[in-house]
């Protein structure tokens, strides 16, 4: 394999990754499909209206639970990211022109689906003068204007730590501002070369100082040690992070980083306990947890704790 699906030549790192075959999943990585009435209704509505959600397009294992709670996730900014993280399935390349009508369409989708809580995430847009800050902020504003009773969670890139860009995004006042650190300092540069660990922590601190509920995520199985996970959790809490999700890395393709280890369910229980002891007000940890999993429930739990 020398060419990526999007047509570009593979990076040397991707060629090296591809030398390791896709790993066999352990028995505890299994999804049970429970299709309740809310899920069934949303599924038919999405198909009928031609709507697009990350939940379906990324094959999220938690779609049955989230849609039953009337929660869904949307991807904005296109399908090409200007950065490349070694765990992420989104393609790296030159994005299409900015679609200024996208916020309205997302807001319409939220209304059509009757969502109680919507998560919005997107690609990095370093090609734009503002790094995409307007697009992220305007999407929140559009959702809130059309759906005043719907909670909004916004998962952002770091916008290179630029205060003006962060201020634009924070000013849209999502219920939760999320920025995912994803991994520990020792391997951070290898896994997320276009980001820095310190800057990611600073983004969370700035959001907390702006009065927002903050959230982050750690992916396990990328080569970190348990002690490093505990240290990263302490760093995140010290930076002002309110909510943490802890997940198992599942390799999207052979050109992505190999799975270094399968973290056992009991280890996730221990990490969750440690996070709670550190003072996180919302914690979810498990092999199939994803950063937007039960997002509305975690927000409400955190809001009660801060009241």
Curated annotation (Swiss-Prot):
Positions that bind [4Fe-4S] cluster 1: 55, 60, 66, 292
Catalytic activity: [[Fe-S] cluster scaffold protein carrying a second [4Fe-4S](2+) cluster] + N(6)-octanoyl-L-lysyl-[protein] + 2 oxidized [2Fe-2S]-[ferredoxin] + 2 S-adenosyl-L-methionine + 4 H(+) = [[Fe-S] cluster scaffold protein] + N(6)-[(R)-dihydrolipoyl]-L-lysyl-[protein] + 4 Fe(3+) + 2 hydrogen sulfide + 2 5'-deoxyadenosine + 2 L-methionine + 2 reduced [2Fe-2S]-[ferredoxin]
One Gene Ontology cellular component: cytoplasm
EC supergroup of this enzyme: transferase
SMART domains per the UniProt record, alphabetical: Elp3 (SM00729)
GO molecular function: 4 iron, 4 sulfur cluster binding; lipoate synthase activity; metal ion binding
Primary localization class, coarse: cytoplasm
Name used for this protein in its record: Lipoyl synthase
Lineage of producing organism: Bacteria, Bacillati, Actinomycetota, Actinomycetes, Mycobacteriales
